[in-house]
Amino acid sequence: MKNLEIYIHIPFCVRKCEYCDFLSFPADDDAKLRYVKGLMAEMIFYGPLMKNYQVFSVYIGGGTPSSIDEQWIAALMEGVFDCFNVLPDAEISIECNPGTLSREKLLAYRDAGINRLSIGLQSANNDELKLLGRIHTFEQFVTNYEVARNVGFKNINVDLMYGLPGQSASQYMATVNKIIRLHPDHISAYSLIVEKGTPFYEKYKFDMVRQEAGMRTEFLPNEDELYDMEKAGQKAFMDAGYRQYETSNYAKRGMECRHNIGYWTRADYLGLGIGAASLISNVRYTNTSDMDEYLSRCRHIHDVGDDIFRANLHVAADVIDKKGQMEEFMFLGLRMNEGVTREAFERAFGISIDAIYKDTIDSLKKQELLVVKAGHIYLSERGKDVANYVMAQFLRD
């Protein structure tokens, strides 16, 4: 059987954060219940189409999945187990906001088969949390983290963010050190990206121009400060026994996120819910992002028969040609510290990697941006600092 991972999008949140540009919004319980029913209809439709797949990862993301009733999460998990071939040791994750967690929810998640939590802390500084528009305090996070451990969760990720307005390296490291002392199994550390259409963009757009131009900034950390934060955090994580296995992700040995690795290695994945994307047999599908349209399409989803290519939830279906597949293989694979292997490339495409990328690899190796060793090709320490440049070299005209 082929491998598959499933992503379930829960778009709801209590309040949208100042920096957030994800597909998320507040809603009442009636709207949430209608949406859950839509997700169930989608699962029932796809189940028979995915009968030749075995599910190794399920990821419930958002939005804030922990903002909806825990019994609805349990119902969704029951639907997943009923409709798909879920492996006994599958990684099953849910994203949580510390401000919407409780012992009751954590027990319900555990009993529903969820075995991994991804808790969005972002900062251990309450002033920074308030600036970000987060609805929780650091103290709430610690309380719920300890409850999660007490009820039996043995795989917990904590999300952190650096490069916040007015943040110094010492402030970021204070957060890093507090989290390390809690010994989570996995840590994700992302630099703040100020996106258009967010409240942060309106506040800091002129600072962004200065930042991109290498000029002195008023609120946002400059490039050198961001670099110092990243490297200081990286050293602290690694000194504490975490292994950096991807650009922004650190894990204790054996606790790497399988869902992330599946994405970076181009495993097939099925996205359920509004705005969700899927990749099945090198065709990328995208669901509608309009809630009313999504619910209407879910009501008539079976009208198209059993052909995934004609499922009326999709507003786009793009076939990825061989060139695009190779490019994705390289720039997604190079995000991981172990990089890509010659063997995996040849197995995927029936041709040696040197036949396609020899000149590019040799050039980047000469610039000391790539390391080629024992069949592996991966970013050097210098290459990691200019990763976007390196990955762009594998985009063929």
How would you label these PLM feature ranges?
Residues 382-397:
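Short, amphipathic alpha-helical interaction segments positioned at domain boundaries
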Residues 2-3, 24-48, 53-351:
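C-terminal scaffold of the Radical SAM
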Residues 345, 361-367:
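Basic amphipathic alpha-helical segments that dock to polyanions
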Residues 376-380:
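Minor-groove-contacting beta-hairpin "wing" of winged helix-turn-helix DNA-binding domains
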